């Protein structure tokens, strides 16, 4: 017979009472009705908030987007292969946020800020909401500092300032990403943090960009956010907001930042896919009604902050891909109306050998003029007009048999100006080099150089200035002004290089 020991029973009871936890946890739990195509319908989440993070039974995360009478429509931020009908879903009470901090520099992350470059976890202590409010009017300052891209055609004719939103738009394979990467490379030693967001691209293309930045020492001040083509639509939709949040962290610390969204057409397509699967009513081109708001709330986060806010800035270079040069389609017109100007790349110019293939006639920078450095502003004033007139005359001259001398001269100069602005990929130029090249073309100092030698002239002039006239480069780089002395040095250098080239051509 088992003997009952009262002291043992009382000891167990005391232990149980001591260990008793009075805290009551309340969780908002529902169950999956249907799942498929990256969308889950959940029943029972009565208290769910719009945009709230949901946690599924298999660990997959989702975002509540549609709050309906009897169910919640959620998008999955993962494959969700372990989610079944009837499995439980828990509302976390949190909005999606990403880790931010200095440790992100040099890393490749996904849309949730998790490392995907095989270098281990990123040690950050701070997080930031993926969706956050854009700075208000009082917190901003007008754009007044230049953001040099290193591409002569842009810095001379379509200048971009820190805090500006400048759209890069064009057909596929016209060099849109090349301009963005060159801009990142040109920020070396400029104390600027760059964030490159790749949306819906091939993993090989992203790996190529990372390798280019690493080889040229630009990865040290850059963060890559990648949502590849194979990833769920929800992650492709979130990637630009993640990039903006990472850049915002540095902006509010007083740093200058640059964010490239490559490209927002694919983000809009991902958002359209999600919206249609959630049974939201389609609008023009089957995009949902709030696709404009989707882009405007992202691009409004770019700003030049006031002195009281720390003087930081976020410059945004969104990229949009057009179909057969149609800039009047829905998404291109939306983003053109949101941004402060656009750089239009033409496939015809690209195929004719003009790289970068910028169509000067319809490219514009609405606020960048105030930020342009005086040195280049003074000499490049007529450049855009001359090139636009040249394009018009060139089209007209195809039908005219005999042209007067002034028209002929304008055509010849236009050809040389166009050649001067050619620039190979991954070779951004410093301000002094741009000033020298544009000055030579606009002032007509290379009219004697054969058209096929203009690219050689450009290269040799830069080499001559570096080796023989370093004082010119130093003065322009430091003072950002062209003094009469510097102009005299430049004229001598140009005539020296021109005479050498003309002699060799003869």
Curated annotation (Swiss-Prot):
The record marks 363 as: Required for activity. GO terms for cellular component: plasma membrane-derived thylakoid membrane; proton-transporting ATP synthase complex. It catalyses: ATP + H2O + 4 H(+)(in) = ADP + phosphate + 5 H(+)(out). One of its GO terms (molecular function) is ATP binding. It is found in: Cellular thylakoid membrane. Keywords: ATP synthesis, ATP-binding, CF(1), Hydrogen ion transport, Ion transport, Membrane, Nucleotide-binding, Thylakoid, Translocase, Transport. ATP binds at residues 170-177. CDD domains: ATP-synt_F1_alpha_C (cd18113), ATP-synt_F1_alpha_N (cd18116), F1-ATPase_alpha_CD (cd01132). It comes from the Bacteria. It is a peripheral membrane protein. Its EC number is 7.1.2.2. F-type ATPases have 2 components, CF(1) - the catalytic core - and CF(0) - the membrane proton channel. CF(1) has five subunits: alpha(3), beta(3), gamma(1), delta(1), epsilon(1). CF(0) has four main subunits: a(1), b(1), b'(1) and c(9-12). Belongs to the ATPase alpha/beta chains family. HAMAP family: ATP_synth_alpha_bact (MF_01346). This is ATP synthase subunit alpha. The gene is atpA.
